[in-house]
């Protein structure tokens, strides 16, 4: 293998320590997915620099390898027919290609149909996964000449006439090609009614989402030429296209208004049919009221109410009960317009209003005779904020009930209520937020409590934990925290200076302190990605094997730090593999590729959850209230 010729498609992002993906010359025609991904039109012939003492190589799949040392030779243009011939000559006659669909799409996208002809003549088959989706999609079919080439070579590409028709109508505005396909002798077996239904699908045959809008011009031509069954056509477009519905109705198509009302039409469609002179009967109104999950339900009911189509007689207990759960604002609008209060279950309405924290509706329930005291326990179980509002509306808390539930989530409003009534202390509330939340959510609440502690000259509990955790998870919170006027000890001052990127006197603070071997400090330095501070700590603790082991584990967070410690210290990089991989950020592919090249198993590198609570790193993170399964 070491004497073989390889091709490099693209240089890696990190050129300080490049890790190259190279492809064996005999299989390069199967690698055009990567060529398309990197949007390149050149490839470079390389040799493996296996004489270099640091040389490493790893087989990824097939004849694709990852290596850290190469010698670049000649760069070739993929748009040169001579290059294509060279790649064909390099091919292994016994190898059966698996993914040449990317190869053909690449050259068609470049309008190099001559090269496609050359490949076809060279017996390079069109094969791969999702070949039709690769060819016939909203991205490739913006190119008129590409689509025309596919049509002319449809048998080679494995595209039946239906596939081409669907693609032409669904993705393009190439009307001449649509006409050509319609008039073709092969279209006689197409079920146009089913064809139209398929055109309105939001996903293709392979389940991929279609984002482009359907152009209706060509469909109107098919309508005019009577390609569809009128009844099937009407109900297909009724569900999916106001434009086409309007078009066929104005052409005089027959429709049954009862069926229209029973369909899931939106407000625009409803208005259109009413404006045509169709009369809404009581049965129609009841159907519309009963379909609470239909398109534009609230808008349709509001429209009908505003235009006097709806009266009290149309409502039942069931309809009103559904609206209570579905939309309190709609219910409020109905109550203000109609006398339907007798149909409302006030107990359910009051509880729903408490859960939705809808004060306006709570007030109405009280006006209608609800005793707010009967709902105080229900409110306490849900939220201290809504409980406080009920108290303001005259509610009384029973002696055996405490308004404060320490297990409820905290908001700034609830924090202030708790403090005003001395239900808990600032210190406890802060610890509760820090310890119970996996990430640094509740940023505003944390800053609110810390601001109150500072203004009252109270110490901030677990400040170290707050600083480290915020540094680990989020730029936003620690940028706000370090703006506060904090009363810091020397240890905390080091943390804050690092977070502020004020490095001038940190080295002295560390060197002359008792914290030089602190694992927490090492953790913060790694999070800062400051290599000078990292070097300082390693130099001071160079004889501490355990400290160096922690440094390597933490360095999973930052590749340049990892590379430094590996190159300069004799650390065992395999001893704590799982912990190292826990530290790697989700999108740090450089570190992942490096460790893979160094012999780490892929299953370890991409393990997103750690089930071993006994690991030292997991225990360390738990002490800081950091969830090791949530990666930044």
Swiss-Prot record:
Keywords: ANK repeat, Repeat. Coiled coil: none annotated. ANK repeats lie at residues 61-97, 228-250, 251-282, 345-374, 517-546. This is Putative ankyrin repeat protein L767. It comes from Acanthamoeba polyphaga mimivirus (APMV). The lineage of its organism: Viruses, Varidnaviria, Bamfordvirae, Nucleocytoviricota, Megaviricetes.
